[in-house]
Amino acid sequence: DIYNNDMSLVEEFLNVDSSIIEMEKNSDLIRMEMNIVEFPIFSRSNKLKTNQIKKYYFSNNKESYLEVVPRHGGIIPGELEERIFIALTKILRNNGFKATFYCTMNDIFDNMKIENINTRRTLYPKVKSGLDRLASTNFRFKNLFYSSELGRPIDDFINTNILTYRAIKFKDANNKEQSFFADKRLKEIYAITFSKQFHDNVIKKGYLTFDADLLLKIKDPVTRSIFTMITKWRYKSLYLKKQAYFIARRIPLAWDKNPRRTVLRIEKSLQDLKDDFYIKDFKTNKNKKWEQADFEIFFDEL
């Protein structure tokens, strides 16, 4: 039982059903498969607690949910783990999308765009712990994947981690692996294997439609989330209109207590995206009440 005495559960209702129904009234929208980019895989909280499970409900009847379960004594993945993950997807691409590939810690730092040697030394134990968190956290998806073949969500349960890894020292390396140790200062290399669900879903449909360097330049995790969402939702269109509530529920950001604060938070992220030329422009429409606010977002030609 994952709910032992030491573990605490935090539940959050994202109530996506109503926003999806609203979205599907718009007949010119293509129903795209919901993929892992759209789930709160990486927590946006900077107050993560040890042994805390997060459970996100995507329907009022609790039939559709994502549960993120840390290893015992650990915390769930957050902002650092997302940056490591994006860097690993880039290394994966450079290795021809093979599910298992080799890399060094310096490869990860290179792809995270961390160049300063002292910063690397400081971050080394944190990135190593982050890699461990990607391997040891369980993600339990219930009724969340949409099949375009069937034309409906699939009624299933998936329990998976993001990846597994093997840390290999020179004395244990085979002939192929020893070639990585040409640099004698290197202590170990990593054989990384993405789980089938993440390899199939993220790699084929998700993060690899994005430029990893562009994502990593967005320092704020909420802004990064908003960018990935609006990019996916707009598809090839140069204009997107979305309710603030809809955006907030998918990050996720708190809504019920203070919609005004959340709308202004989204607005700040959109302003940052505009300032850095990720989007062309945007307009906030309050529509009399903050609860009814929406955003119009404009993009440059692809």
Q: Language-model segments: what does each one mean?
A:
Residues 1-302:
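Charged, alpha-helix-forming regions
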